[in-house]
Amino acid sequence: CGRVGLVAHALNWRLGSDELTQIIENGQPKVIITQGQFSEIARDLQGKINFIDHWLEYGSDSNSSFDILIEEASSSEPIVPKNIGDNDPFFILYTGGTTGISKGALHTHKSAYFGMLNQTVAERIVPSDVYMLTGQMFHIPVLLAMNYTSHGCPIVLMNFDAELALNLIQEE
């Protein structure tokens, strides 16, 4: 997203339709991509929100619109706009903070870079590390995973299962 000037805007799958509507209306995204298992709430949101240009789905229980888009996409690298700067938006994360009402925290390319640099130093990341992402993909763990990926580290994605996690840690 960031390389071509798009702003990533992940949504918390645990929220209800009204909360998601508020977040979407606040962030004003142009495209929403959902997994097939969330198609029911996506249809509900489509009935409430009229400014989204594209609603895409992926996965086995979906209309495959995202999968089709990817299959038909060019294999060449996208043209990188020259006007994307350090202080331009990169991603927005929503948090209930102290009030319980979702508020967007907009991160720039620069804030993401320095956050990743801080993590790299603090965790001493090296390419032989393996990152197990068990946190929420709609919040900061996804940025942490991007940092490990940028160092060439493999990422393990999983729904948290204590026994499975311990077995994976022991194997690695």
Identify what each model region corresponds to:
Residues 1, 32, 89, 95-98, ...:
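Conserved S/T- and glycine-rich ATP-binding loop of Class I adenylate-forming
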Residues 113-130, 138-172:
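Conserved AMP-binding/adenylation subdomain of ANL enzymes
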Residues 21, 81, 163-166:
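Short hydrophobic/charged patches on amphipathic alpha-helices used for structural packing
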Residues 16-19, 108, 161:
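Short loop/turn segments at beta->alpha junctions
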Residues 90-114:
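Conserved AMP-binding A3 loop
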Residues 57, 74-94, 101, 124-130:
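Conserved pre-ATP/AMP-binding loop-to-beta segment of ANL
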Residues 1-6, 26, 139, 147-151:
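Short hydrophobic alpha-helices that are characteristic scaffold elements of the AMP-binding
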Residues 3-71:
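Structural core segment of the AMP-binding/adenylate-forming
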